[in-house]
Amino acid sequence: MAGQKIRIRLKAYDHEAIDASARKIVETVVRTGASVVGPVPLPTEKNVYCVVRSPHKYKDSREHFEMRTHKRLIDIIDPTPKTVDALMRIDLPASVDVNIQ
């Protein structure tokens, strides 16, 4: 697999969970002998939802809720078959979305 690259994108609402998952992936890759670039923090996506507090009137009274989506990018340079096997076996929290390219 010389000259190849694996790109892993992580997405989560909790920044502590995504950082712990990225740390676990980097440790696994380094232990199996491949080189790694990252984790690179990508821009945090912020969605704000405005909701009227009252069910009937008083439209001026509103409440704002926000959801932040944290993202990280990890590149694995020249992965070995042992690296790919270790990545398939790694156990990550369900709250972290992993996209491998």
Curated annotation (Swiss-Prot):
Record-linked SUPFAM superfamilies: Ribosomal protein S10
GO BP terms: translation
GO cellular component, one term: ribosome
Keyword Iron-sulfur (UniProt): no
Family matches, as InterPro entries: Ribosomal_uS10, Ribosomal_uS10_CS, Ribosomal_uS10_dom, Ribosomal_uS10_dom_sf
Statement: the UniProt record of this protein carries the keyword Ribonucleoprotein: yes
Any one GO MF annotation of this record: structural constituent of ribosome
Keywords on record: Ribonucleoprotein, Ribosomal protein
Homology family: Belongs to the universal ribosomal protein uS10 family.
Record-linked NCBIfam families: PRK00596.1, rpsJ_bact
Quaternary structure (record): Part of the 30S ribosomal subunit.
Known function: Involved in the binding of tRNA to the ribosomes.
PANTHER family referenced in this protein's UniProt entry, alphabetically: 30S RIBOSOMAL PROTEIN S10 FAMILY MEMBER
Protein name: Small ribosomal subunit protein uS10
Organism: Mycobacterium ulcerans (strain Agy99)
Gene: rpsJ
